[in-house]
């Protein structure tokens, strides 16, 4: 579908808990109401609940109009609710760009619009 919306947006904020996920979910609802296939992506997340899920990732998935696999929506998930680069180091994981780009391109193939939510703040 041809759209006046950009094909991808990056959403960032000045800190954690400032409304990035809330804003992404609101935008996903607007895009869905415009008849667009839209999906959220949080490439790197930290902090999981008892079921091993991240609340931001779950909110993005619930708001999307595309049922994308969790592994594409969130390629890197760390259990500890700390800065992702620290959590990655503690788990011996190196956050690589290639898996993130691969997931992004797979989502772009399924949706008119992809909203990418950054971690923390800048």
Which residues make up each language-model segment?
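Hydrophobic anchor at the beta1->P-loop junction of P-loop NTPases
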Residues: 11
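Switch II (G3) loop of P-loop NTPases
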Residues: 100, 104-122
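N-terminal phosphate/diphosphate-binding loop that engages ATP/GTP or pyrophosphate donors
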Residues: 3-8, 22-94, 98, 103-106
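Conserved glycine(s) of the Walker
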Residues: 18-19
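Conserved glycine-rich cofactor-binding loop
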Residues: 15
